A protein has these predicted regions:
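Helical hinge/lid and interdomain linker segments adjacent to catalytic or ligand-binding clefts
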Residues: 1-57
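Short, hinge-like loop/turn segments at secondary-structure boundaries
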Residues: 59-62
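Glycine-rich, aromatic-lined ligand/substrate-binding cores of catalytic
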Residues: 65-167
Length: 167
């Protein structure tokens, strides 16, 4: 999709089917262009389009292009860009060190419709409480949550959702 984005226009739908968090700036530009041209987009997992990356040549003697995925995760840098290139490789949403014109400040939900929320590896996630107001969502059909009454809540088991999810 990064190199041959125009091929997306040959299709009615683009399906992103799994934990696809590392995207190059050109990949995102191409998917946005396809969307703007009428291609339907489907994102079937969480934590997509999160880290902005770039492609580099292989480290082998032949230096084959597009063989090395580069991500300095500059969002984790406290105050300065650490990637030696001028291309931002932090999160798409981070505007601190990279304005939208060069790759930052453009959150993933502006493309996917959802925002990555939790990355809680190695800790004990707390139980999740579902209020009555959410009980009628389709997700809860045929579960005990769907039977909540006004003022009631349901509590999911600790660690139920895993350690990464979107909002």
């Amino acid at each position: 999709v990064d190199r041959y984005g125009s091929l997306l226009l040959n299709h009615k739908t683009y399906i992103d089917a799994g934990h696809d968090e590392y995207w190059s700036g050109q990949q995102r530009t191409n998917v946005e262009a396809a969307r703007d041209a009428g291609v339907n987009l489907m994102f079937w997992s969480g934590n997509e389009v999160y880290w902005r990356t770039r492609w580099g040549n292989a480290y082998s003697a032949d230096g084959t292009p597009y063989r090395t995925l580069i991500s300095y995760k500059e969002t984790w840098s406290p105050s300065a860009s650490i990637d030696p290139s001028n291309e931002w490789t932090g999160t798409f949403r981070d505007p601190r060190l990279s304005p939208p014109a060069v790759g930052g400040g453009n959150p993933e939900n502006s493309l996917t419709g959802q925002l990555f929320k939790v990355d809680d590896v190695g800790s004990n996630l707390q139980a999740i409480t579902i209020p009555y107001d959410d009980a009628n969502l389709r997700f809860w059909r045929n579960t005990s949550v769907a039977n909540l009454q006004p003022g009631q809540t349901a509590t999911l088991t600790k660690n139920y959702l895993g350690y990464e999810w979107d909002e």
